Amino acid sequence: MKMIVGLGNIGKEYDKTRHNTGFMVVDELAKKHDINNFKVQSDALIADFRVNGEKVLLVKPTTYMNDSGRAVRPLMDYYDVDLNDMIVAYDDMDMPVGKIRLRQKGSAGGHNGIKSIIAHVGTQSFNRVRVGIDHPTKESVVDYVLGKFRKEQITDFEIGVQNAVAALEDWTTIENFSQLMNKYN
């Protein structure tokens, strides 16, 4: 089984905000596979589909961003998901809007959702797909990440989401993560 985790904050007030990038990636992947009914389990919204007979679990933690690990770890345990079979999609302020980057490990880079997952899984070594949201120029970091994309950013962001979805779909079938990084980075 593979597990794709999209990070974000639950609630209408956070819809389409930069910090909900992971949710938007998972939602787009779900849409592509005609999935529209997530259910609640272990502080998360989950759904699944199959690729070549293997189950792929989509996860959107409902714990709010800063406590995402509290939802992720119990699902990994319940479904017996190995760290190599999990990937996390999330926003990255240190990359231009829409740019994606895949990594197998690394620090949280100041991202509280990733900090929480690292704390709950006990390692920095897990797969990630980061989608650039750019860095604020005038507003505070909190206001920026909890704000919506500016009109001139939307097209680049949507391309980034589509590229992240393509990378995640490839991830479900490619054994060698380095090949995937070479293709998308």
Swiss-Prot record:
GO terms for biological process: protein quality control for misfolded or incompletely synthesized proteins; rescue of stalled ribosome. InterPro entries: Pept_tRNA_hydro (IPR001328), Pept_tRNA_hydro_CS (IPR018171), Pept_tRNA_hydro_sf (IPR036416). The keyword Oxidoreductase does not apply. The record marks D91 as: Stabilizes the basic form of H active site to accept a proton. One of its GO terms (cellular component) is cytoplasm. The active site is at H19 (proton acceptor). It is an enzyme of class 3 (hydrolase). CDD domains: PTH (cd00462). Its EC number is 3.1.1.29. GO terms for molecular function: peptidyl-tRNA hydrolase activity; tRNA binding. The keyword Transit peptide does not apply. It catalyses: an N-acyl-L-alpha-aminoacyl-tRNA + H2O = an N-acyl-L-amino acid + a tRNA + H(+). It is found in: Cytoplasm. The record marks N9 as: Discriminates between blocked and unblocked aminoacyl-tRNA. TRNA binds at Y14, Y64, N66, N112. Keywords: Cytoplasm, Hydrolase, RNA-binding, tRNA-binding. Monomer. Hydrolyzes ribosome-free peptidyl-tRNAs (with 1 or more amino acids incorporated), which drop off the ribosome during protein synthesis, or as a result of ribosome stalling. Belongs to the PTH family. This is Peptidyl-tRNA hydrolase. It comes from Pediococcus pentosaceus (strain ATCC 25745 / CCUG 21536 / LMG 10740 / 183-1w). The gene is pth.
